[in-house]
Amino acid sequence: MEKWWFNSMLSNEELEHRCGLSKSMDSLGAIGNSSGSEDPVINDTDKNIHSWSDIDSSSYSNVDHLFGVRNIRNFISDDTFLVRDRTGDSYSIYLDIENEIFEIDNDRSFLSELESYFSSYLNNRSKSDTHYYDRYMYDTKYTWNNHINSCIDSYIRSEISIDSYISSGSDNYDNYSDSYISSYICSESVINSSDSGSYSIRTSTSTNGSDFNIRGRYNDLDINKKYRHLWIQCENCYGLNYKKFFRSKMNICEQCGYHLKMSSSDRIELSIDPGTWDPMDEDMVSIDPIEFHSEEEPYKDRIDSYQRKTGLTEAVQTGIGQLNGIPIAIGVMDFQFMGGSMGSVVGEKITRLIEYATNGSLPLIIVCASGGARMQEGSLSLMQMAKISSASYDYQSNKKLFYVSILTSPTTGGVTASFGMLGDIIIAEPNAYIAFAGKRVIEQTLNKTVPEGSQAAEYSFHKGLFDSIVPRNLLKGVLSELFQLHGFFPLNQNSIK
């Protein structure tokens, strides 16, 4: 969506224009400056202002001259015009020709003619022989690039008097960066707020240098929702990350470096060499052992729902593979499946994985991401803590094998109290939320405020809770060095990276 800012001469008494409207309206250059002033941006002399009443309106209304309806192709199908009147008040005009939408953000009486006229125009236009119908606009595809080029050419010819900017994603924009118009086009920061439907614009070339906060009647999120699937918003800085490249960036925010949640499949792809992954116990599913009663949704239905949503059978994936050529056994929990909660199936799969690693003398990695024990399975889920810990004891103490625990955000509850903290080496991701009880539970139980950041990985690291904080982009190399340090080497020495 393109945004235009005009220092328009609009008042409550009459609509006025910055230049003579008797000029040709073949382009947006109709809104221009023909005075020859050295500074067209701040030139507000009376000789350049013509009242609507000075224009012959026998054929067209005032609105015709303001928007150049005879050549409506000068507007693309989705434009927002940001306008300031000479009293200093600001408002926006939103025009969407394709969807027949015309809105003004302030219900001012002197704008009623404008809104009612254009609404009528959009609703009643027809392919008749009238001066309102623009055949070029409706009969052919007027491309974005052609629109940008024609606008810039028009602006250069008429030395347009625009206060700030045109902001677009056109590739052709850079081709004009050294031209005359570049002095009137500047980079602006438009901060969208999906909650309030408002945006803030800083006009760096404004005469008073002030900020204008303009609230529209429409919601920007609704207007741009067809583009939302292209972006992922950071939970920390709220910056946008292009979804197509986000996976290759290991779900790390490009703006602030925050580590967002990853699916278990993505983590396996990150850690395991291509073509070496061999999953275990994929057909193991829960059968609602205690027939948990729920008024909202039966436990079985909820399991089925998450299976369809994630493509997984349970909240953990286990299997064997190679990490830089080193054979390993690995289990990866997935928070997207019922919050990574540990039920009987999760406990059984991890226990079998540890036993397989014990029998095969393989190094073991478990990536934790869990809210704790699964309440829908009652004491059976709590029993998994002891069950996994028992298998881990045999693996570590009796067989003297090497177990690395990786704590990601969040790792809480029964997972923290059992195998999450039993690793020979415990690694945490940056800014990971690691705790036994959550902040809300502690505050409600003890009636005390939990200090901000006291359950973050960095705070726990300084208290000695685990061994290292390793970013995702370095994790595979760190693990490879740890395994080799403990006597686990690649099957093929050429696999070392």
Curated annotation (Swiss-Prot):
Cofactor info, note text: Binds 1 zinc ion per subunit.
PANTHER family for this protein: ACETYL-COENZYME A CARBOXYLASE CARBOXYL TRANSFERASE SUBUNIT BETA, CHLOROPLASTIC (PTHR42995:SF5)
EC class of the enzyme, as a word: transferase
GO BP terms, alphabetized: fatty acid biosynthetic process; malonyl-CoA biosynthetic process
Protein's recorded name: Acetyl-coenzyme A carboxylase carboxyl transferase subunit beta, chloroplastic
Record function comment: Component of the acetyl coenzyme A carboxylase (ACC) complex. Biotin carboxylase (BC) catalyzes the carboxylation of biotin on its carrier protein (BCCP) and then the CO(2) group is transferred by the transcarboxylase to acetyl-CoA to form malonyl-CoA.
Keyword ATP-binding: yes
Keyword terms, alphabetized: ATP-binding, Chloroplast, Fatty acid biosynthesis, Fatty acid metabolism, Lipid biosynthesis, Lipid metabolism, Metal-binding, Nucleotide-binding, Plastid, Transferase, Zinc, Zinc-finger
Domain of life: Eukaryota
GO molecular function, one term: acetyl-CoA carboxylase activity
Assigned protein family: Belongs to the AccD/PCCB family.
Residues that bind Zn(2+): 234, 237, 253, 256
Subunit structure comment from the entry: Acetyl-CoA carboxylase is a heterohexamer composed of biotin carboxyl carrier protein, biotin carboxylase and 2 subunits each of ACCase subunit alpha and ACCase plastid-coded subunit beta (accD).
Domain CoA carboxyltransferase N-terminal: 230-497
Originating species: Platanus occidentalis (Sycamore)
EC number, UniProt record: 2.1.3.15
One Pfam family of this chain: Carboxyl_trans
Positions of C4-type zinc fingers: 234-256
Cofactor dependence: Zn(2+)
Broad class of where this protein is predominantly found: plastid
Signal peptide range in chain numbering: none
SUPFAM superfamilies: ClpP/crotonase
Compartments where found: Plastid, Chloroplast stroma
This protein's record includes keyword Lipid biosynthesis: yes
HAMAP family per record: AcetylCoA_CT_beta
Pathway terms, separated by semicolons: Lipid metabolism; malonyl-CoA biosynthesis; malonyl-CoA from acetyl-CoA: step 1/1
